[in-house]
């Protein structure tokens, strides 16, 4: 699961440009100095124009007196459109659910807005009845941990604005963020800061069935182009080296590492922004600095079994670098947050932890070793890593959030379901990108976990999943579905857009994708479908985007990329209709 990323609203962000399509698409990327949006126009000027447009069109944008907008991202499309994603404060207080994207033409004229809150974000009062100390006590009690400093915020989620306190809480099972109503003392939300791949619901189902996960590890070696002490002749250190990982799940893999001395190597990739994997040594720490560096005298990492602590590290580093390469080569994205900063991971995290996480506090992947009972091995599998790192991409863009979380940690709501779906969509794309014969690509998630049903989720026919109760089609009840169960709606739409309906075999996997209305959908191909969904995520989705909003976002993206009269645009509409998401059934009061 992902956390509702509401710990804080950034007060300073890098303004960057971003790609729009797949490999070969021209794009402007972030770098040092001034970024040029067009001849004579900087991205700072684009952000300023978008900010001015937001205040000049208050009826459309909802921006008003007391509001301040801070640019999170500036996106420049090859065809000339500009999009600026803003986070909002009101009278100096961060607004949860107040994010918006302002759209401009090539000439910086206002063309529209995508906003998370369609209601006023000004609370009825800005005077709290609770003290910060009282809010901290309530948060500590709710989350079962030690509270940090409470800060006043405006909570504009759930259709109304309220004055609240946001409180970080450090508990035994990891950090969480609690939002407490500043007038009534009611706990409005209590959200873990980490995203677990295996949800509490699926773990409970496995326990009830007595089913264990014993992922099958790889045997044999994958041929490598570069191995050994390739940087040994370097005159100066540190230097780029090319080593070999002997992983648990994909055999031998090439790893780019850092040579620090003649026979001293560090599991850190200098060609990918310093991306690094460390050893948590059984601690449940959210501080990457507390992880122990992996070093070697031979530039060989692991032995392919759990007897070497380096084996899981090899899998993790391989999965992270493949994910980074997918996003860069497909979309020009430079790192998870598109800021040319490293991706990071810690393996051997916690004592008998049977899960893997994206942790937004750490900004890194965390992998447990398994609990020794139900989960037998570390979940350092390629699609798990691609899925979880995509939550990081969503955190850096739309910040899709669930609408509620129960006492067991299960999350609910369409925006949260869409987040899970996007993680599955791009996680499967990472497999196709890597195209590793030891991990054949497919539209299944968790197929290497050793589950009795042979997968955790699948995109072509989601309801074949009997563990989480994933749905194939939208209905009004999906708004209250657990997020992994609800994710099937948009995952199914993506598969239909990419591959079409009916029976087909791709690689070694046979698919048979149904449609709600009995229609036949002819896919446009995975490359184009992925371009549409990525552009929709980065340009047209916000924290509250639901499935009908996602339909609108992908139609806008298809129009941008291929034109409103194109086959691609029509197929996007058909794919959503085939999962029962249409303009006609758009709920009038979903916001």
Predicted features and spans:
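Segments that shape or occlude catalytic/ligand-binding pockets
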Residues: 2-14, 18-215, 219, 341-358, ...
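Topogenic and prosegment regions of secretory-pathway hydrolases and membrane enzymes
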Residues: 2-9, 15-17, 23-28, 201-276, ...
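Short, compositionally biased low-complexity segments
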Residues: 24-36, 103-118, 276-305, 462-467, ...
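Short, polar loop/linker segments at the starts of domains and inter-domain junctions
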Residues: 125-130, 265, 460-461
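Acidic/polar low-complexity interaction segments
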Residues: 164-168, 186-329, 338, 353, ...
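Zinc-dependent metallohydrolase catalytic domains
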Residues: 310-386, 394-591
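Active-site neighborhood of glycoside hydrolase catalytic domains
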Residues: 389
